[in-house]
Amino acid sequence: LTAAQIIYPCMQATDIFFLKADICQLGMDQRKVNMLAREYCDAIKRRNKPIILSHPMLMGLKEGQAKMSKSDPDSAIFMEDSEADVNLKIKKAYCPPGVVEANPVLDYLKHIIFARMGEFTVERSERDGGLIKYASYPELEADYVNGTLHPGDLKPA
C-alpha cells in the first residue's frame, strides 16, 4: 500500500468527527470509510457513534461515466440547478433505445423517482401511444427494452 492509500481513508473518517456529525450520508463507494469511523468509536470507547446512511451512486449523464462528477457540470444534476438546466441535462443525457445497462436516465428513475414517488407517468400524444402510468420500475424497464417506451418520450416526462 502507498502512504496515500493509508492516510486518505483516515482523513475522510476524521472529517466525520471534526464536523461532529451525528449522521453521515455518503455513497456506497464510501461505505468502508464510514465503517472505519464507527470501528474507531469502538476502539476509543466513544458512546455516540455516527449514524451511517449509505445510498447508491448515480451514474454520470454522459456515456461511459460510472458516477457523476462535480468537475464536469454537464455530467451531474446539482441541487442548485434550475428546472430549465435539469431539463436540458436530461434531454442531452446518454439514453440509448432499448438499452438498460449503463443508462443514466433509467438509473435516476430507479433510484430517485420510483424510490421516492412509487410511480411514474409518461405523457405523450395519442398518435404516439397515449399516456402510460407505471406503478413499478420493472414495468417501465420492460417497456423500454421491448421498444414500447422510447427515449424521446421518456426524457421529457
Regions found by a protein language model. Give the residues of each.
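N-terminal Rossmann-like or analogous alpha/beta NTP/dinucleotide-binding catalytic cores
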Residues: 1-11, 34
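Short, surface-exposed recognition loops or helix-turn segments adjacent to catalytic cores
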Residues: 1-2, 23-30, 51-55
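Conserved nucleotide- and phosphate/pyrophosphate-binding catalytic cores
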Residues: 13, 31-157
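A long, hydrophobic alpha-helical segment
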Residues: 14-28, 38
